[in-house]
């Protein structure tokens, strides 16, 4: 903290008022008061008249009288002093000094003359000589108060000079000498306060400032600096009180107004972090009252409004913060976050680039720019940005997570998992990396061991211990009463999950199964509003929960008396597993959005069917499996799909195989099998569509891999992401046969393919993710296209391609075949689903609650084994919950790149002090 030394030249000298020294001695004769009309020319009357003229600032007239007197009596000490004072007011210091010196020569103990000599020395900057003169005056007359006051001033100035020269202790000594001379001299206390503040002896500093304010109640600077000390100590309320006292005596004191704005901004952040966002906003606004262009208050208002989901207001205040502080890279960064969440990626890129033009090594903006480039499929540019972020901050855990997302999207699962694990080394509690790692492991899991199950279980146990669980509910245990079903998901928009949740929302019997939707959609679209209107029209309840803390959502679920809570996301983007971990509903279920166990001991059931998870499956689950009578999915086609196009092979003269699955599913083994098929079917072609193919290096790597497998690149067409759903669906007109992926099969892509008349070849496996295609194709009536192994997969594909006429016939009938199958029979599906819910509820009413048994086992294991307790002990979970999931083609969107990171909220600016 830097304080301004009290410049005693700003102090009005107590010695001179209207040119006259307070307490100067009169001559031995009494000076009478003359009337203006009376002409006095001699003796003491003349001296008195001259003194009166001088007191009335008529210095020229007074000077003439003094000079006239001295011509007659050169030894008149009072006349010499009076003449000196008049000359002093005319800035004739040398002549004035001669007059005072002559007076001293005539009267060596004249305190008034000695004091005025000191004043002249001080005006010339000769502080030592000034002090000596004042000391002589006091030696001549110890009771002469003006000399004492002047000596205190000059000793204070000497102290300041010594301190500025680096002689702090000697300076302090001078301040104390000043106070010894004049114990009521406030500036000496004030300057001691400044010195002690610089020495970080804040208790001493406060004591000195308080004494300065006591001696001079209007001492604004002292109040201001007291406020600075309290603010730096974290006592914001006391700091604000001091600034208020300062501004009460000096309303236009700019330093204090600025400091008040800083303190109010910090107090706003403090109360906001304690949970009172509204009061925080009030303090930020009050800060702007004191400093209307204070960028930090505007910035923090942007943060607060963002947390309140008032994004338009947040944008306004970030823009203002940047306007008033063009060096505020954080404001640009956070603007980028908001624009990205609104899908305005070009504007987001512009904001991040602006932030980086201010702070080239700003790790957050480097990371966030990499996130946007990843979303856009610009993998090379994304990798460059994220690697720069890591270089700028090697311990930036989420940057490693985002690198993993990039590798996953580029199809390099091994490197993705390595990156996630690197993130977890830095931040073991990174929720994004932990869940992304689990998801990534599904892409290469063939069910040969239990490693993936153990990874889910361990994550689930650890995560559950971070949340308090409800263990009892007020829900009436009546097995036959209407049941309240809660669906919770961020994917009630044009997203893969939406195609499978629409049937239940539409066809539930709302008289027996009340539906409550908890929508965590980041950005609602037309489908969101259509779903909401449909639910409300049928008597259900729709609640938007985006941005609400997961534990608060759990409280909402409990207050709504949800009987069965169904989460639809698993370990994918923006999931609400934190709510599920609190166990707010008596029965909890996972379904649709994730092809594996959640790992949470608080989830009772996972919905599936006997083909996706056969009764003899070796795959382990934390949840108890509930198999629906037909397919565990019911697909509602997009109304924008358009008509089925003729088989392209009829006009092309060759068969085109294709896949619109993401690259993460197209593993090296999948490419080997596809290459075998293409090589076995002369002149056939392969069309693959996915987002990263807008990147040349990804395209080239993909083509090179196929060429190494014997497939010429000229036989391969690679398409990037197609934005509009109608165009995406019509792109199926390019292929004759769809090739499924393994061991992570397609879901939405398979349904889309079949609906557009394109038969799909799939392969059965040992895990749920592998068998989704088996369930879909079998229930549509295409069980003959399910292979048992790779060789059969190749042969089925080759055989299907060998008869174009039969292929064409199948294509033109496939939509009707699918529409009449259980896969698209919404009413029938809803009945089966409701039956499953009813059975779950009946079990609960009987006291059969799988999750309670697991929780008891978990608590027993933790109690019996201290190592488990240590491993699973409470720890902080870092959740970055604002990244928007990209539209996925088949059923599960990964937990996204961690959020474009928002910058810290605390004010950055240092206090100024008086």
Swiss-Prot record:
EC number(s) on file: 2.4.1.255, 2.4.1.221
Biological or metabolic pathway of the protein: Protein modification; protein glycosylation
Effect of deleting the gene: Altered root epidermis morphology and root hair patterning.
Name listed for the protein in its UniProt record: Probable UDP-N-acetylglucosamine--peptide N-acetylglucosaminyltransferase SPINDLY
Gene encoding the protein: SPY
GO annotations of cellular component type: cytoplasm; nucleus
Region Catalytic region: start-end pairs: 431-914
An MF annotation (GO) of this entry: protein N-acetylglucosaminyltransferase activity
Location(s) in or outside the cell: Cytoplasm; Nucleus
Organismal lineage: Eukaryota, Viridiplantae, Streptophyta, Embryophyta, Tracheophyta
Catalytic reaction equation(s): L-seryl-[protein] + UDP-N-acetyl-alpha-D-glucosamine = 3-O-(N-acetyl-beta-D-glucosaminyl)-L-seryl-[protein] + UDP + H(+); L-threonyl-[protein] + UDP-N-acetyl-alpha-D-glucosamine = 3-O-(N-acetyl-beta-D-glucosaminyl)-L-threonyl-[protein] + UDP + H(+); L-seryl-[protein] + GDP-beta-L-fucose = 3-O-(alpha-L-fucosyl)-L-seryl-[protein] + GDP + H(+); L-threonyl-[protein] + GDP-beta-L-fucose = 3-O-(alpha-L-fucosyl)-L-threonyl-[protein] + GDP + H(+)
Cleaved signal peptide residues: none
Keywords from the UniProt entry: Biological rhythms, Cytoplasm, Developmental protein, Differentiation, Flowering, Gibberellin signaling pathway, Glycosyltransferase, Nucleus, Phosphoprotein, Repeat, TPR repeat, Transferase
Family per record: Belongs to the glycosyltransferase 41 family. O-GlcNAc transferase subfamily.
Compositional bias per record (Polar residues), positions renumbered to this chain: 877-889
InterPro entries: Glycosyltr_41/O-GlcNAc_trsf, OGT/SEC/SPY_C, Sel1-like, TPR-like_helical_dom_sf, TPR_rpt
Function in brief: Probable O-linked N-acetylglucosamine transferase (OGT) involved in various processes such as gibberellin (GA) signaling pathway and circadian clock. OGTs catalyze the addition of nucleotide-activated sugars directly onto the polypeptide through O-glycosidic linkage with the hydroxyl of serine or threonine. Probably acts by adding O-linked sugars to yet unknown proteins. Acts as a repressor of GA signaling pathway to inhibit hypocotyl elongation. Functions with GIGANTEA (GI) in pathways controlling flowering, circadian cotyledon movements and hypocotyl elongation.
Organism: Arabidopsis thaliana
Swiss-Prot/TrEMBL TPR repeat ranges: 43-76, 77-110, 112-144, 152-185, 186-219, 220-253, 261-294, 295-328, 329-362, 364-396, 397-430
